[in-house]
Amino acid sequence: MLVTGDLIQDDTPEAYERFRELMLPLDLRVHCIPGNHDIRDLMRPVCCRPPFSYCAWEEIGDWLIVGIDSCAEEDAGGRVTIDELERLAEIVSSSPAKHVMVCLHHPPVPMGSKWLDTVGLRNGDEFLERLHTLERVRLAAFGHVHQEYDAEHKGIRIIGTPSTCRQFQRGSDDFAVDENPPAYRRLELLADGSIHTELVWVSE
């Protein structure tokens, strides 16, 4: 399971422990990355204990999956630091995997929503260019936007997933929520580098 940030709403250690308790019965490895609403110092102790991991990587078949931190201090928008870009490059270069999926919280491309695009990834162009230099990156997956997104950027699939809470109205100039229910996404990463995906909307 990949959790692309904003794990909790109230900034307490107990909230992260509650998240952990809710996930454990699924009996899955849970890869977590921080979102702009997360408090890293509270999140790490909980999400570094197996079967959870924090900004980690894993090789599954022909794929390498890497979680990176795109959060910036005191900024709802994000930035992938030079150190984090170098960490990503080192992980990819040391892996024999044929295909790479990178997970982050903030969208590296505009969403076409005036207010939401002010809190995207500040260095999205730089981030995408670095992904292209790594050559094996096939997919970048993100959260943050509370809506569906699926497009391609110079051969790299860019996918955003709706929230497991409430959704934002697509294309809106100002903050607005819509009536869509919570959702999650299933991903099938195939040996030839292709990607099959399905959105699952969860009715109450």
Region spans (language model):
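Binuclear metal-dependent phosphoesterase catalytic core
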Residues: 130, 149-204
